[in-house]
Amino acid sequence: MAGAWLRWGLLLWAGLLAWSAHGRVRRITYVVRPGPGLPAGTLPLAGPPRTFNVALDARYSRSSTATSSRSLAGPPAERTRRTSQPGGAALPGLRSPLPPEPARPGAPSRQLHSKAGAQTAVTRFAKHGRQVVRSKVQQDTQSSGGSRLQVQQKQQLQGINVCGGQCCHGWSKAPGSQRCTKPSCVPPCQNGGMCLRPQFCVCKPGTKGKACEITAAQDTMSPVFGGQNPGSSWVPPEPAAKRTSTKKADTLPRVSPVAQMTLTLKPKPSMGLSQQIHSQVAPLSSQNVMIRHGQTQEYVLKPKYFPAPKVVSGEQSTEGSFSLRYGQEQGTAPFQVSNHTGRIKVVFTPSICKVTCTKGNCHNSCQKGNTTTLISENGHAADTLTATNFRVVICHLPCMNGGQCSSRDKCQCPPNFTGKLCQIPVLGASMPKLYQHAQQPGKALGSHVIHSTHTLPLTMTNQQGVKVKFPPNIVNIHVKHPPEASVQIHQVSRIDGPVGQRVKEVQPGQSQVSYQGLPVQKTQTVHSTYSHQQVIPHVYPVAAKTQLGRCFQETIGSQCGKALPGLSKQEDCCGTVGTSWGFNKCQKCPKKQSYHGYTQMMECLQGYKRVNNTFCQDINECQLQGVCPNGECLNTMGSYRCSCKMGFGPDPTFSSCVPDPPMISEEKGPCYRLVSPGRQCMHPLSVHLTKQICCCSVGKAWGPQCEKCPLPGTAAFKEICPGGMGYTVSGIHRRRPIHQHIGKEAVFVKPKNTQPVAKSTHPPPLPAKEEPVEALTSSREHGPGVAEPEVVTAPPEKEIPSLDQEKTRLEPGQPQLSPGVSTIHLHPQFPVVVEKTSPPVPVEVAPEGSTSSASQVIAPTQVTEINECTVNPDICGAGHCINLPVRYTCICYEGYKFSEQQRKCIDIDECAQAQHLCSQGRCENTEGSFLCICPAGFIASEEGSNCIDVDECLRPDVCRDGRCINTAGAFRCEYCDSGYRMSRRGHCEDIDECLTPSTCPEEQCVNSPGSYQCVPCTEGFRGWNGQCLDVDECLQPKVCTNGSCTNLEGSYMCSCHKGYSPTPDHRHCQDIDECQQGNLCMNGQCKNTDGSFRCTCGQGYQLSAAKDQCEDIDECEHRHLCSHGQCRNTEGSFQCLCNQGYRASVLGDHCEDINECLEDSSVCQGGDCINTAGSYDCTCPDGLQLNDNKGCQDINECAQPGLCAPHGECLNTQGSFHCVCEQGFSISADGRTCEDIDECVNNTVCDSHGFCDNTAGSFRCLCYQGFQAPQDGQGCVDVNECELLSGVCGEAFCENVEGSFLCVCADENQEYSPMTGQCRSRATEDSGVDRQPKEEKKECYYNLNDASLCDNVLAPNVTKQECCCTSGAGWGDNCEIFPCPVQGTAEFSEMCPRGKGFVPAGESSYETGGENYKDADECLLFGEEICKNGYCLNTQPGYECYCKEGTYYDPVKLQCFDMDECQDPNSCIDGQCVNTEGSYNCFCTHPMVLDASEKRCVQPTESNEQIEETDVYQDLCWEHLSEEYVCSRPLVGKQTTYTECCCLYGEAWGMQCALCPMKDSDDYAQLCNIPVTGRRRPYGRDALVDFSEQYGPETDPYFIQDRFLNSFEELQAEECGILNGCENGRCVRVQEGYTCDCFDGYHLDMAKMTCVDVNECSELNNRMSLCKNAKCINTEGSYKCVCLPGYVPSDKPNYCTPLNTALNLDKDSDLE
């Protein structure tokens, strides 16, 4: 069949034959199915397939690979060949053998011919010499020798491929045997190819050529299988397992290659045809299939886009590749995999994800490919899906009209269409032709590859279903893919049964039911969209397996939603669709934990539940209520899918039904290009358009109602413009629902398998007529990123009768249903289904192999009978189920027949029915077909039903230069031509006459086929005995002058000396003009010399060491150049780069200084400029400073803080500053501050009637008695008491005198008595007693030995006797103190005749007589000053001061001071004593406690009371806490506990500044142990004495015992019976009843029995004792101090210091 165009499909399966001493022997059977042969010059069309068989026996060792022939070894085995024509058949991925070349006119025949004929053939090739005829004697001698060898071989060799007692031409003996079973290929097969038969190499995938010497990378323009004619549709090569014999496959429907898993084969076209076929696709530069022997097997997958139905032959872009490898990692697998691992199946789904961003909002979208099943047998590929160039292509765009997806966002359109989706016809274009693809081979999705690993348990697939064995065998699947691609692994399973057993494999997206009614395998996709899914078993609580609860499908945070109706078990819920489960409250389903190795408690995969410790069982999700709302649930292995009702369609995961999208209207209307802000449509187009065309192009609004077009990027826009702005989908390509009703008949649309199955599943033929086919297309919205397929009109083929008029037209294409369903094609020859007169029959998508999971069945609205075909889609097996009113019937596929007993389609055994099949061979029945196994020398006929003899003589050069005689199953060679002799192998071989020396004694002898020729020797040689010997020319004189001679074969060569070059014939040496080269003597002049040259250099250059260049002189090597700078060499010169402040000299050989002071007048403005080497200096006068610009500027001294402050302002001047002081202040000596003016230095400022008191910024005059300061404050003026005190003298006259006044009586004999205020008669002179003037009153002082004696004032207005006769130590005014006389002296007796404690009772202080003296009430006279911090009780004479408990009275300081009990060692024995105000604390070290006396620390006794353990921590104590809660003034010298700090020293404690409780709070009282154990008497000497029986310390601050709180325990306000319940105090139980113990700052009002506020400012602030230099302001329960003007608060509480003193202290502290 010369010029035949072959397309090959390949199916490989293997079986274990036997073990031998040399290793395992596998029998690999190649089922080769070529397409129809065509005459040269025609294109291939669909035709009846023919089946041929080739059996190959191969031996491999454990370390070999199945794809390499280099390891083949072992004993010979019988080899059976099947081809479709002479020349054999090519295997997939290999070039087809060249057909026999037809005889050319005038060429010599290859039959028996004479020697003259041979001479004619030789003459055509002879160039010189004469023709020489061999002698007959030589021929006879060689022939006889060969005959003897042939006889010997005939005695030894027997069997096939034996010709004349020896191996036929192209065959040799196999090692270790005497059988001619080893083919030989010359040249040998390269690149791992295998010699299948003589001169025929079977190449590895990716290589081709006669000897497999050409790789895929070298072949850039490889022709494809075939083309397409108008009115025809290309039929791709289907997998071999789907094909049948001619008898059963004459009418197989044609299918389109869209979205199917195809095998790319590139056989070489026949002669003549290759000139007419345009190459379409560059060869795919994919990786070879890597099959690792044993544990790991790799597959190379490429994502293939889903193109439109009209597809030219060949493959598409190689964009994105998946490298899939499965196997066990070393060290991680719990078992070891040997070479004999059985059939392993991997089910996966490839995906490509991308990120789409619109206006800053990005989202991910993933596009899934078809679910794919790969099978390996014993670690080797076992089906065509594992071959090289197998690709899974996912298309983002619905390319139409035969367009192909060449990249993720581009359609490669045919010549007659254009546009983004190939939807726009090109005017004037011809019919579709073959075209080139612009896509470059090997283009990947990304620049690098990501490696990901998926860990799954190895399941077992057998007749009982799919089970997971426990402990599971863990399989790591390694996937290499681009970043945007991913692979979702669904299942890795081992198919049990004997090796080589043919298992009916399940197709992607389908389910299969075995003949026993049990599920065999379902490969439905698990409902998941994760790009890198790692399936890991769940672990559930055992106790929850039998409990029922509600199943929730959504869990957001702690909220559970989408509850399924009804109750289910936790393992059923969480193992399938649920995320949470529970009855009263939901709990999240446990996560699947990743693991390495295995354990005994591992649970099952998603979709399975555990049966026992060994196996897992599929969960029937359809038993869960509400799984498929608006649809019908179909269970699959490990998952489920939904078959939706009318008006609904499946979502991308087939797990729910969603409403159908609305159809795009074809209504036309006006299209407006502009919409005004007032919603007014403007600028309509001249033609009416549909809304889709308008809004997807230039329109802004559409229709008579001015409907605004949706904005780009919105869902509404994507609905009508799927191709984006500027692209529309024409009406004939729009989607229609697949389940739309069509009249009264049903059209079965059947998805095409993407993988070979063991049984042919094609429907029988039907009649049709030549019209465009109409069918329904899928309108279901696909998953994210999956392209929506379109349906295209094809050339007229055939028609299905009784179709509605409103249908979409299409050619036999494959609209994609979902990522889990393979391609769909229409069978135009399907028989008419039984009509029903009631409701229309539903449209069923019937997949091959009976797919319940990939079909959609829409139940009729009013049909009540049971549809067995819907309930069990696989009920017929290998056939189509037709539902009948009663039961059902089956229309079986070719090769099957309907069995009434089994009610299904069973296989027909053709070998048993037809005995005449496979003559000369053996008939072997197969599922749905049969095979003819032919012996060696025979091949199957074109019909595949018989074995016919192979005429080996038709092959070229079988018997070279001899006669070939064909025999049954072999051939032989006879009768050699003249010049030839019979070889030992039975072939005619040429006689070499040139082996005889005398044949050509003085010429060269050249042997030729069948003859020889004497040719004269060429120049440089001489002839001798048929050979040409070389002549040595170098022996001749004067050869190669100026050089050396080297003899060569037939010539000589001159090697010239330096400066000379050889002539073109290399036989002479000539001078080289080096100056012509142009690269010599640069920067100089070149002069040529004989054999050399000379350079003359210019200034600044010198001759190089090689004397061939003028190189620059580096002047910078001289150190004296460029002082104060850097020397930079230049070409032929140099340059000085001077430092800053220098410049180059006139000669440019050094740097000289720049005098900036002379050249730049702007420098040093306001100062003096001094030039320096390389720079200059500026000297600025005082008050000026140097700025950045080298100028002097004024210093703003006033910017300094504190200058002239606080009693002045700073005034900046040029070069200085000036202080402007406030009134009363003057500038200091240094002029930087304002100091107070001491006005009192001038003694006259307050004259003689007072003294001056200087103040800050001023002064005041303190005037004597009788004088006062005027309003201006200058001096002291007399006070006119007579005007100020009216009636001061009564009836006497008032006379003002300086500093005082006089009362003058009108009668000179009367005198004014100040006691009575009247004038009375003068006493007689003989009264004997001299009247003394009135005693004046001044201040009484105490403790004159104190440094601050001026502050020790007892009372301000007392007489001298009242002071000195009581407790006073001195008397005076304004600190002018007159000490009191010492008791016991005459002065004291004269002043105090009655002694201490008595004062005169009358006016006169000097009257004698006891009756005139009275007891002095010191408590009344001196107030609180006489008994500070105590209670004063007057006695006669004297007084008593009663102090609080824990304090004592100091008679010198007249004050009650705290008693330091810690001075007594008996106060705290074995503990730490801490003195407190009025008491002390005894601290015991843990675990010691106080005893009953509370004065000794002892070990605690065993008791039932549990004493709290408290650790003692010491830290800093802060004495002050600001209003912002900032700690300051830490206690210096010691660290304290929290209790010690808060109760004794500070306000906060620790580095965290822990606050102490408020001192008036109960927490403080409890912390610091301040219980009140008695009451105070209001009167009497025991008023401050508590009624406690003994005086003791306060309670331990860590342990407050209850006995100290008994008096306050549970006393409520109602129990007191006191008004207001002791407000501002607490109720205390006393012997007489109850009383109030007032809080600090309050005292008890006995009349009202309430606690009233103490006005500390009026009662306690005598002589500023509370607020020193401050004003006292009373508050509720306390008081506060506000400093007087000129004073500021000090660090002492309630003490204000003068402002100057505070400033000085601040300055001192700053200095420190």
Curated annotation (Swiss-Prot):
Glycans are attached at residues 339, 370, 416, 612, 639, 761, 793, 929, 1011, 1042, 1051, 1133, 1216, 1242, 1357, 1479, 1678. Disulfide bonds join C185-C195, C189-C201, C203-C212, C395-C405, C399-C411, C413-C422, C551-C573, C560-C586, C574-C589, C622-C633, C628-C642, C644-C657, C671-C694, C681-C706, C695-C709, C696-C721, C869-C881, C876-C890, C892-C905, C911-C923, C918-C932, C934-C947, C953-C964, C959-C973, C976-C988, C994-C1005, C1000-C1014, C1017-C1028, C1034-C1045, C1040-C1054, C1056-C1069, C1075-C1086, C1081-C1095, C1097-C1110, C1116-C1127, C1122-C1136, C1138-C1151, C1157-C1169, C1164-C1178, C1180-C1192, C1198-C1210, C1204-C1219, C1221-C1234, C1240-C1252, C1246-C1261, C1263-C1276, C1282-C1294, C1289-C1303, C1305-C1319, C1340-C1363, C1350-C1375, C1364-C1380, C1365-C1392, C1419-C1432, C1427-C1441, C1443-C1456, C1462-C1473, C1468-C1482, C1484-C1497, C1517-C1541, C1527-C1553, C1542-C1556, C1543-C1568, C1616-C1627, C1622-C1636, C1638-C1651, C1657-C1672, C1667-C1681, C1683-C1696. SUPFAM superfamilies: EGF/Laminin (SSF57196), Growth factor receptor domain (SSF57184), TB module/8-cys domain (SSF57581). InterPro entries: EGF-like_Ca-bd_dom, EGF-like_dom, EGF-type_Asp/Asn_hydroxyl_site, EGF_Ca-bd_CS, Growth_fac_rcpt_cys_sf, NOTCH1_EGF-like, TB_dom, TB_dom_sf. PROSITE patterns: ASX_HYDROXYL, EGF_1, EGF_2, EGF_3, EGF_CA, TB. Key regulator of transforming growth factor beta (TGFB1, TGFB2 and TGFB3) that controls TGF-beta activation by maintaining it in a latent state during storage in extracellular space. Associates specifically via disulfide bonds with the Latency-associated peptide (LAP), which is the regulatory chain of TGF-beta, and regulates integrin-dependent activation of TGF-beta. Outcompeted by LRRC32/GARP for binding to LAP regulatory chain of TGF-beta. This is Latent-transforming growth factor beta-binding protein 1. It comes from Rattus norvegicus. The gene is Ltbp1.
